């Protein structure tokens, strides 16, 4: 009697890893890094195994539930990886400087914002099914920073698998919209030669001004866990004298255990922070994360009393030199979300990007989505009407910078 052939299920090649022992498998880690090295994703730093371990450890708080979705091809080789953690996302109802209310949603966070694998709809639909199953207790799946022109964004908007189970929503978040970055050449000399003459001369002049003022600039790099306490002490001192402090913005919020957080990053080779000293005095700081050939500039600040010396510009310029001066020069630098003059000064590329939320199709989520979208439309329309009909004396006044945005005159 002939046996009936077994039909292989669609997700036969998919495996959801949830144990630390499986995460640490040497063969998986090697293949993980191979896939990362071929990825064009600017946020591949946050797809790395090192960042995944840092994210799930959640230093200073409770560890997060985590998983790695792995897909194997016909030959058994891993051809797609999706690292995930469960955390809380939020939809905030923001009008100008005021946050009226914030709804928190349990979410499966896709680290690096994109699936790491072949870019085709069937493949992504298959991976989504595995993510959906693991995140069945979550209200949504979050892609924190998706380029508008990426395959991931087009798939999220058009996939039938997404439309059947989720509401795709890209909420407007104040301070987002564009990401600025720099694609590095092989050396710092090549970077300088690629600048237009005006910018090149301007950078070098600002460095010389420090020498002429008797305050020569010195860049200090911090990489090890043992250096974290000193970095935090010096950086917090600078932050207290920064323009951000004047508007109530703290780059090191007290509800975060920065000692634990940065020390854990350092132990995983992710921590790369800087202090600029001018004549021996702390003048500016830069907070960064480095992995997979990319440096992410996550926060910066300078002592406002030294603004005439352009410490922020000098700091960033010297950081570029350091990133390109080592035995393994980095390939890219990301300044993240936000359109500010200093980013335009240093970056050679920008692109539109958004946070994308895949909200489960539930009555509560649909009500929240419709309410938030309608509120955002109302706020946008009100702003347009105000700008059109505001009194003439208001038009003559320059608007104050948004929180997190350095004044144009600061550098």
Where are these regions (language model features)?
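Acyl-donor binding region in acyl/amide transferases
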Residues: 88-170, 174, 292-350
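Short, surface-exposed linear patches
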Residues: 41, 92-93, 102-106, 163-167, ...
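A conserved beta-strand-loop-helix scaffold within acyl/acetyltransferase catalytic domains
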Residues: 14-100, 146-157, 170-308, 408-411
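Active-site/acyl-donor-binding loops of N-acyltransferases
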Residues: 2-10, 156-189, 327, 331-398, ...
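Intrinsic-disorder-associated interaction segments
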Residues: 21, 25, 120, 196-199, ...
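Short secondary-structure junction motifs
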Residues: 138, 214-216, 271, 330, ...
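Noncatalytic linker/hinge segments flanking ATPase motor cores
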Residues: 60-61, 107-114, 123-125, 182-188, ...
């Amino acid at each position: 009697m002939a046996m009936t052939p077994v039909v292989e299920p669609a997700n036969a090649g998919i495996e959801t890893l949830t144990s630390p022992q499986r995460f640490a498998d040497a063969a998986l880690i090697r293949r993980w890094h191979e896939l990362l090295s071929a990825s064009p994703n600017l946020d591949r730093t946050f797809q790395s195994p090192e960042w995944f371990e840092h994210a799930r450890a959640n230093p200073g708080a409770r560890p997060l539930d985590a998983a790695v979705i792995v897909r194997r091809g016909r030959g058994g080789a891993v051809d797609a990886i999706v690292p995930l953690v469960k955390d809380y996302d939020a939809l905030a109802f923001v009008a100008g400087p005021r946050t009226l209310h914030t709804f928190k949603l349990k979410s499966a966070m896709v680290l690096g914002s994109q699936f790491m694998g072949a870019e085709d709809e069937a493949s992504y639909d298959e991976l989504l099914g595995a993510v959906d199953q693991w995140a069945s207790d979550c209200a949504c799946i979050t892609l924190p920073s998706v380029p508008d022109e990426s395959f991931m964004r087009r798939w999220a908007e058009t996939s039938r698998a997404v439309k059947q189970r989720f509401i795709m929503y890209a909420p407007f978040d104040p301070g987002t919209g564009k990401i600025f970055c720099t694609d590095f050449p092989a050396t710092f000399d090549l970077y300088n030669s690629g600048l237009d003459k005006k910018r090149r001369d301007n950078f070098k002049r600002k460095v010389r001004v420090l020498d002429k003022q008797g305050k020569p600039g010195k860049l200090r790099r911090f990489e090890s866990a043992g250096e974290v306490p000193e970095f935090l002490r010096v950086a917090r001192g600078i932050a207290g004298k920064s323009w951000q402090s004047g508007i109530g913005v703290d780059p090191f919020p007290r509800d975060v255990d920065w000692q634990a957080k940065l020390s854990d990053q350092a132990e995983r080779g992710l921590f790369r922070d800087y202090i600029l000293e001018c004549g021996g005095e702390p003048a500016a700081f830069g907070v960064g994360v480095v992995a997979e050939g990319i440096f992410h500039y996550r926060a910066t600040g300078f002592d406002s009393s030294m603004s005439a010396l352009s410490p922020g510009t000098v700091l960033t310029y010297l950081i570029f030199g350091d990133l390109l001066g080592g035995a393994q020069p980095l390939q890219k630098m990301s300044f993240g979300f936000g359109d500010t003059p200093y980013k335009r000064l240093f970056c050679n590329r920008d692109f539109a990007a958004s946070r994308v939320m895949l909200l489960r199709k539930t009555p509560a989520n649909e009500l929240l989505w419709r309410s938030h979208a309608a509120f955002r439309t109302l706020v946008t329309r009100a702003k347009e009407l105000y700008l059109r009909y505001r009194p003439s004396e208001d038009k003559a006044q320059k608007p104050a910078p948004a929180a997190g945005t350095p004044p144009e005159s600061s550098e």
